[in-house]
């Protein structure tokens, strides 16, 4: 009888005070599906969610319960294995899972690598979602926010629209070396005079194509461009010719991953602001390239 009275009293409190009901739910732990997490993401980006987008599920069942979330730059096979070992069954990746922008798999029908990756995702009940277009489109751009934070260059940012920084004066070689150390990069490549003193730097992340890179380099207030990757026969040759003409220009290529991965580290922190009671962790993909000079 006493237990029944207590239950009725508690029910009455919840009816009178909806906030108490919310608190009780939070205290007992919220179960969410991957689809529900994505709906929260859609509600928290500042841009309108587009119907034509690569930001879709790439594997697994969106209606499965999320035990934990792993954010990553690339859902590599090793990243998937690490996520599984940590109990993080929902992987949010920035780049494709199946080696092409749209994650099309028809052309890989008999490919053993793709088949094994698909099988691993299925057998381990993992869910993979790509978060690319809207992470770039939200304001501020999530990848850029993470990169500026990792670089520690917020105080040097002079033009946020064109990502131009006024840095303490240093040589191109010293700047390239500092970037290599900052990102533990194994394959930084440079075009230009290593001894040239520079202060005005621009940042163009990822692989946007040559024209955004060249348009940045043609500015009078840009001496050195820090970029992810490029077509060597376009931006690289543009800078080589500019240097041959006596223009104060240089290009530092740090690799696509190194130019964007910090943004997915930041994504994990961003998600924690509105996804509660679910473990969220960033897993690095790691630089896939290596330099024979570094092999001992």
Segments (PLM) and residue ranges:
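Positively charged n-region of N-terminal signal peptides that target proteins for export
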Residues: 1-4
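Hydrophobic structural segments
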Residues: 6, 12, 17-296
């Amino acid at each position: 009888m006493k237990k029944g009275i207590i239950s009725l009293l508690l029910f009455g409190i919840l009816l009178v005070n909806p906030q108490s009901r919310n608190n009780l739910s939070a205290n007992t732990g919220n179960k969410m599906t991957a689809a529900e997490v994505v709906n929260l993401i859609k509600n928290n980006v500042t841009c309108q969610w587009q119907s034509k987008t690569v930001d879709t599920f790439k594997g697994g069942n969106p209606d499965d319960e999320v035990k934990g979330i792993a954010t990553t730059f690339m859902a590599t096979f090793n990243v998937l294995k690490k996520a599984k070992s940590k109990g993080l069954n929902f992987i949010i990746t920035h780049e494709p899972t199946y080696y092409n922008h749209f994650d099309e798999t028809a052309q890989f029908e008999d490919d053993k690598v793709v088949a094994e990756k698909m099988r691993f995702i299925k057998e381990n009940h993992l869910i993979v979602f790509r978060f690319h277009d809207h992470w770039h489109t939200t304001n501020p751009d999530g990848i850029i926010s993470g990169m500026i934070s990792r670089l520690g260059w917020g105080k040097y940012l002079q033009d946020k629209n064109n990502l131009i920084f006024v840095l303490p004066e240093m040589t191109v070689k010293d700047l390239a070396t500092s970037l290599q150390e900052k990102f533990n990069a194994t394959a930084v490549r440079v075009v230009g005079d290593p001894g040239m003193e520079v202060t005005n730097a621009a940042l163009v992340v990822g692989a946007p194509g040559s024209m955004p890179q060249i348009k940045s380099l043609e500015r009078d207030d840009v001496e050195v461009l820090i970029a992810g990757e490029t077509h060597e026969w376009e931006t690289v040759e543009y800078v080589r010719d500019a240097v041959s003409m006596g223009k104060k220009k240089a290009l530092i290529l740090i690799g696509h991953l190194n130019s964007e991965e910090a943004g997915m580290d930041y994504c994990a922190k961003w998600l924690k602001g509105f996804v509660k009671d679910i473990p969220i962790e960033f897993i690095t993909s790691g630089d896939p390239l290596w330099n024979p000079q570094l092999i001992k």
